[in-house]
Amino acid sequence: MRYVFIVQGEGRGHLTQAISMERLLRENGHEVAAVLVGKSPARRLPAFFARTIQAPVEMFESFNFVPSASNRKASSLKTGLYNVLHIAGFVPSIRFISRRLKDLRPDVVVNFYDILGTLGYRFSRLKSPMICLGHQFLFLHKDFKFPSSGYSGHYALNFFTNMVAWGAAKVLALSFRPMRDDPKRKIKVVPPLLRPEVLSLRRADGTDDPAVRDGGYIHGYMLNAGFSQDVLEWHSAHSDVPLRFFWDRADEAPVKVVDETLSFYYLNDEEFLRQMAGCHAYASTAGFESVCEAMYLGKPLLMVPSHVEQKCNAYDATEGYRMDCGAVDGVKENGSVPRPAVTSDSFDLDLLLHFADNEFVADKSFPQWARLADSVFLKERTFL
């Protein structure tokens, strides 16, 4: 079968999912004719993606999260205003996607959570089906329950997510753990789509690659570089704790060495994974993909959401486990409930270290769930 991918270029997660999906399809005799990637002035397409993806990559202007003045969290007001004011500028992108789909004539379109991809698909009047893929679709599931307060932004998020899924033949919702499907909403719950380089670090027989160890340092990733101030302030008081953080500062050197125990790295996927495998604990802005990588390797997690979508991820990775297990005071009938992560509004590394040493309970079923991905995804792309 012949596929075209449409990929949201914001952050790292959707890009690595596209890499994994292309590899899976090619290994099973399918063709990926093109990868259409949404770009924005604030982000540069990571070199690891351009280097790894085999299909031709074509770019189009797409929606963008606009950070606050401190470049820490996404500003809902600024993001909304920016994208509304630039809406006319997105019309050429919709036309571009529509035209390319007509030219390429794929058997299947895979949309990695890009709203302009959905609109371009609809305007193309293509008869081929569109599959939507992303963890955000799990928030539409009938069994996904939000808390009664503090998450009002999920209404706008779910409205947007419903728009992305408009006209999809099937919706594949990436999840930390198995859940029943939601046929009414065309939602199939599927494992995270991790790359072979990640899966090979923890084998099916339970043994680990020698690279997986506790190297004593804290590893981290911040989508918005403004969080680096949190890290610098903590480091000034705890200079004995090694820190290795990745950020999106393309204007800095590939590795910015602050001193012997603190370095900032521009995003490089091979180096990122190497540092993940060897860390004591991991701190992140709660993006789905790297959280799954840490959970797969059994690393304690600090999740620092920078916008409502990541806040929902953090909720799912913490309280979601308690709800699923019907736990009371953190205990279920046949043992401890997994507690892979803790959340904070800042990069509170004291909290992470305390959690790692005293409260962390790995989700030991997660690696098995993640290893099911290839067979599940091949099945879902065959039976449309």
What residues fall within each predicted segment?
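Donor-nucleotide binding loops and adjacent catalytic segments primarily
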Residues: 195, 202-278
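Active-site-proximal region of nucleotide-activated glycan assembly enzymes
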Residues: 129-189
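Leloir-type glycosyltransferase catalytic cores
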Residues: 163-170, 177, 321-384
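Conserved nucleotide-sugar phosphate-binding/catalytic loop shared by glycosyltransferases and other
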Residues: 9, 27-28, 32-86
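Conserved nucleotide-sugar donor-binding subdomain of glycosyltransferases
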Residues: 72-108, 115-116
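A short, glycine/small-residue-rich beta-strand->loop->alpha-helix junction that serves as a flexible
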Residues: 7-19
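Glycosyltransferases and closely related glycan-assembly transferases
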Residues: 49-52, 95-108, 118-131
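A donor-sugar binding/catalytic signature common to diverse glycosyltransferases
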Residues: 109-112, 274-313
